[in-house]
A protein has these predicted regions:
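N-terminal signal-anchor transmembrane alpha helix
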Residues: 3-32
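Hydrophobic cores of alpha-helical transmembrane segments in multi-pass inner/ER membrane proteins
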Residues: 16, 65-76, 132-141, 198-215
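C-terminal ends of transmembrane alpha-helices
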Residues: 21, 25-26, 35, 106-120, ...
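Interfacial/capping segments of alpha-helical transmembrane domains
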Residues: 28-43
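Interfacial helix-start motif at the membrane-water boundary
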Residues: 47-71
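Cytoplasmic juxtamembrane regions at transmembrane-helix boundaries
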Residues: 75-102
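Membrane-proximal helix-loop-helix units in multi-pass membrane proteins
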Residues: 100-146
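Terminal transmembrane helical module of multi-pass membrane proteins
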Residues: 140-224
Length: 224
């Protein structure tokens, strides 16, 4: 069950809409003060308490959704190794892609397991490293797609653009300063908050784009 093309083709199309819907509903039920798209991070939806008020509905929706995203990312990259290895290309790069992809998924799941208001240091660790690992993954994946005939180079060019956006976001994480500086308590600078939301959306789109290419390959093989 873990080794299955289901995780490459169908699972992303289940988990991405589910997560996006969870975010919208969690934002609606976010405890007072209202959730602000430009000044509240996504992970604030997953807080257990907001201003000492129980934020149970948003907490459950967001964290379960994000855990599922991390779970699917891990299994996506576990199976991508076998998908790309049909041509016996560089096994070292492939194995590195698999391991780093799984670690990235574990980190995304970790963000959902450790709420920011209860376990802040663990939350920040998993949040940051999910993007660090994913940047390495996106670089390796771009290289490997260029090296193989399994996927068209259009998917490599798409992932190359994703690499650029992700690298800019990682730069912001490392050198963008304190996002809370000069902001009221519980609010953060818009450049950090909006960038986070855009890169998460980009991750979703990039994954679905890859899934389309993989599905096309399998369909083409059936017609050979």
């Amino acid at each position: 069950m873990l080794k299955s093309k289901f995780w490459l083709i169908k699972a992303p199309w289940y988990v991405v809409p589910y997560f996006l819907l969870s975010v919208f509903i969690a934002g609606y039920f976010y405890i007072d003060p209202p959730y602000k798209i430009t000044n509240n991070f996504l992970s604030q939806l997953g807080q257990i308490y907001v201003n000492e008020k129980l934020n149970l509905v948003s907490f459950l929706l967001f964290n379960i959704g994000l855990f599922n995203v991390g779970f699917v990312i891990s299994l996506f990259y576990y199976n991508l190794f076998y998908f790309l290895n049909v041509e016996q290309i560089n096994i070292f790069f492939l194995r590195a892609l698999q391991i780093l992809g799984i670690l990235s998924g574990i980190c995304f799941a970790g963000v959902g397991i450790f709420p920011t208001d209860i376990t802040f240091s663990y939350h920040v660790f998993f949040a940051n490293y999910s993007f660090y690992f994913l940047l390495a993954v996106s670089i390796l994946q771009t290289i490997l797609i260029f090296k193989t005939n399994v996927l068209s180079n259009q998917y490599a060019f798409g992932y190359m653009m994703f690499c650029v956006f992700l690298a800019l976001y990682v730069r912001l994480l490392l050198f963008g300063g304190n996002p809370a500086e000069g902001m009221p308590e519980g609010m953060f600078q818009a450049k950090h908050v909006i960038s986070q939301k855009l890169i998460v959306l980009t991750i979703m789109i990039a994954t679905l784009h890859q899934s389309i290419g993989i599905n096309y390959y399998y369909k083409k093989q059936l017609n050979v």
